Design a protein with these regions (language model features):
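Mature, structured domains of secreted/extracytosolic soluble proteins
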Residues: 2-7, 15, 20-184
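Contiguous ligand/interfacial binding patches
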Residues: 12
């Protein structure tokens, strides 16, 4: 019953974040300017970004390219090559398929959330942060540290939004500087 309530709240959280629109001050986002909407899918946008090659390989290995080419919308908090390398886990090969999928689900939330949406939700939350449920059924907490947006997973793993987001036809790619799952 508790799980049903949690899933019932997920669309409400998405709508509360998505309702922010583009009204928030984009200057608040630091170096994360919003790029123009693209006709590319999330999978193509990730594939075109040079610093997300490792993530693209994890997506292929997990067999989730089709999901990120589908309807969506989703927001992918995309760890850069250096972040995935620092995690120290090789997620290639058939034996790592389940781990690859689990890692990806921990970095994807339903809905298309721009940096402005996230900043506006944090501001409405009074600076105490705002939470969003991932596709892995974990909670991510978004807060500000100075001008940076920090994401904290339930297990304590943290990452910051970095670089420019990419608005794709079926969601948003938000680059992050860390992995949102602690190494087991």
């Amino acid at each position: 019953m508790r799980n049903l309530k949690t899933w019932a709240l997920a669309p409400i959280m998405v709508l509360s974040l998505a309702a922010c629109g583009d009204k928030a001050d984009k200057a608040e986002g630091g170096d994360g300017a919003t790029s123009a909407a693209s006709s590319k899918t999330l999978a193509a946008a990730i594939g075109d970004e040079g610093d997300l090659d490792t993530l693209e390989g994890v997506i292929r290995n997990a067999g989730l390219s089709g999901v990120l080419e589908g309807k969506g919308p989703y927001t992918v908090f995309a760890p850069a090559n250096a972040a995935l390398g620092a995690a120290g886990t090789d997620l290639s090969g058939e034996a790592m398929k389940a781990q690859s999928a689990a890692l990806l689900r921990a970095h994807i939330v339903p809905g298309a959330l721009t940096r402005a949406d996230i900043l506006a939700a944090i501001a409405r939350g009074g600076g105490g942060g705002v939470q969003m449920r991932t596709m892995a059924d974990g909670l991510l907490t978004f807060s500000k540290d100075g001008e940076a947006v920090v994401i904290t997973a339930a297990d304590g793993a943290t990452a910051r939004l970095t670089g420019d987001e990419t608005v794709a036809s079926n969601g948003v790619v938000q680059p992050v500087d860390g992995v949102l799952v602690k190494a087991g």
